[in-house]
Regions:
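A charged, aromatic-enriched C-terminal amphipathic alpha-helix characteristic of glycosyltransferases
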Residues: 14-15, 330-375
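Conserved donor-binding/catalytic core segment of Leloir-type glycosyltransferases
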Residues: 191-210, 216-221, 230-231
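N-terminal strand-loop element at the rim of the active site
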Residues: 11, 32-77, 108, 235-241
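Nucleotide-sugar-dependent
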Residues: 282-298, 310-312, 316-317
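Glycosyltransferase donor-sugar binding loop
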Residues: 229-245, 263
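Nucleotide-activated donor-binding/catalytic signature segment of Leloir-type glycosyltransferases, i.e.
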Residues: 243-271
């Protein structure tokens, strides 16, 4: 099949870019011909293994650097162009003989726009992907999904581990599992080889409101039976955050086994850092991650790393797979005891983590994603 991936969002390098790469590479793997279908002058962040077709209707509209009032104007402009792109996609599908169109990052606004364009009458399947629907969005999503039901070639695919639509009677909505994120061209230790010291990796952007001292105090107090190392990365964007992280480094410089990385990790460097630890600590997650899939959680699975994670972060994963634990964040003492127990029992539980990471990688595979999208 010739499958067009209609991408109209300019994204920084991150999991959105990687999601498009997953689609392209797995479509190729399964014998399809992917095509990137994008607005004119689209600034690709990476090179995809696909040819590119361009939409009529103008360039991508971004909010970068815009103030509150400018964003209001730009949102209207973006909506107008989105409808132009969808009309153009309808024409391109005929001219270029596409067999299907995938819109990889959609919202209810995309459905609303699509219903005002020729694309709703597409003769080929149009698969709109939604990366989770939170309670605040649900009513709007259901309203637009119902309006879309008469158009039988428009398929709404919600990536989720929940079932929040069972009573809504939406025959055009399918719930599909998220895919894992895997390293590119780097070996993965699927055996979870036991090494000394056991290395815990705490990665991410640091902001002053994040209470990393909580975790450092717990690590400092913990009594471990095996050698342990904690790598704490702090990627900082603001001067005040950078100064505060430097202060933390100074305060905890005498704690044995703690290594601070005050730097950004991008691309291969990020992947090597994740592959270089034994366990990932991901303590921060907003409530929305109960409804939207967490890139960090599915990166840990794809990299075969057990995870100590925020309780809000896709709890269904830990309910079905023994790949880590939800963090006890009530107090430093409580987390200290959890950390001690987790680390000290790791050598004995490693085999179970290994088995369940393999099972999770199968359930959340790229192959299953494409088959759940286009059959």
């Amino acid at each position: 099949m010739k499958v067009a991936i209609l991408e109209s969002i300019i994204m920084p390098a991150g999991h959105e870019v990687e999601f498009d790469r997953i689609l392209v590479d797995e479509l190729v793997q399964q014998g399809h011909e992917p095509v990137m279908l994008v607005p004119e002058k689209f600034p690709f962040k990476i090179k995809y293994n696909a040819k590119t077709d361009y939409l009529d209707g103008g360039e991508v509209v971004t909010y970068a650097g815009a103030n509150k009032f400018e964003k209001l104007f730009l949102s209207i402009k973006r909506e107008y162009r989105r409808k132009k792109w969808f009309d153009s996609a309808y024409q391109k599908s005929i001219e270029n003989n596409y067999d299907a169109i995938i819109i990889p990052t959609s919202t209810y606004r995309y459905i609303r726009s699509l219903l005002k364009t020729d694309l709703k009458n597409s003769n080929i399947p149009v698969y709109m992907i939604f990366h989770g629907i939170n309670p605040h969005e649900k009513d709007n999503f259901v309203k637009q999904a119902r309006k879309c039901m008469p158009y039988k070639n428009i398929h709404l695919k919600v990536i989720t581990l929940r079932d929040d639509f069972k009573n809504d009677g939406l025959t055009n909505v399918d719930l599909i599992a998220p895919p894992v994120f895997k390293p590119l061209d780097l070996p993965v230790d699927k055996e979870l080889t036991l090494k000394e010291p056991l290395t815990l990796g705490f990665f991410g952007q640091y902001r002053r409101e994040k209470n990393v001292r909580f975790f450092l105090d717990a690590f400092k107090k913990a009594k471990f039976n095996i050698p342990v190392k904690l790598i704490m990365q702090g990627a900082t964007a603001r001067t005040e955050d950078s100064e505060e992280f430097d202060k933390i480094i100074s305060e905890y410089s005498d704690v044995p086994g703690v290594e601070f990385w005050h730097k950004n990790l991008i691309g291969p460097e990020w992947q090597k850092a994740l592959l270089g630890v034994d366990v990932i600590i991901a303590p921060y997650a907003a409530e929305r991650y109960r409804y939207h899939w967490s890139a960090m959680s599915f990166t840990a699975i794809g990299f075969y790393k057990p995870i100590l994670q925020s309780p809000e972060m896709n709890p269904e994963v830990l309910e079905h797979f023994n790949v880590g634990e939800a963090l006890a964040l009530d107090s430093v003492d409580k987390f200290t005891k959890q950390l001690e127990k987790f680390v000290n029992e790791y050598p004995d539980k490693r085999a179970k983590y290994k088995d369940d990471l393999a099972k999770a990688n199968d359930i959340f595979s790229h192959e299953r994603l494409i088959k759940s999208l286009i059959g």
